[in-house]
Amino acid sequence: EYVATDACAMKIRAEDGRSVSDEDIRYFIRNLPNGKDTEHFSTLDASGSTSQAANTIEAIEAGSSLLLIDEDTSATNFMIRDELMEQVIAADHEPIVPFIKRVRQLYREKDISTILVAGSCGSFFHVADQVIQMDRYLPKEITKEAKKAAKAYPLKMKLSDDNIKLQKQRKITLPKAED
């Protein structure tokens, strides 16, 4: 077996409890309770959604051109809000802008692709360029079928929420290894 990927690919996941220092996560998280700053977000104990937002922004700042996301290790509320939740709790009362609303914008504006492994949320079929099903551990291309099925369940949410722009690539300084 062989595996090939872009050298700039980054695995993105929720990491409850991780620390975050001075990250601009406004692209995904805004208007936190008690006026907590998301332009210079810092915490010693991030939630699943704020940690995944920080991981995503850090990957972008490091120059990643490919985000690798597994639904199983993601914060559900970071990835998507279903239409019933959007109807009951208005978007302006919810601090999280779900990844599904930003994934196309990331590609359009920053040329950042996403590979998402999902098994329970078909809403991503609406924004996918390609859908591959694993059938008995073998990949099977099913984009046409997935897009056709998705038409029966139209997304009612607006995908790109506002005009917050991502920051330019930030220089990441790595510690030097000692001999």
PLM segments and residue spans:
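Conserved P-loop NTPase
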Residues: Q130-D179
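Generic detector of bulky aromatic hydrophobic side chains
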Residues: R26-R30, K110, P139, P175
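Conserved H-loop
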Residues: S113-L116
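Phosphate-binding glycine-rich loops and their immediate beta-loop-alpha structural context
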Residues: E1-A62, L66, T73-A75
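Short, flexible loop segments at the rims of nucleotide/cofactor-binding pockets, characterized by
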Residues: T43-S47, A90-H93, K110-D111
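Conserved P-loop NTPase nucleotide-binding/switch module
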Residues: A59-V103, Y107-R108, S120-H126, Q130-E145
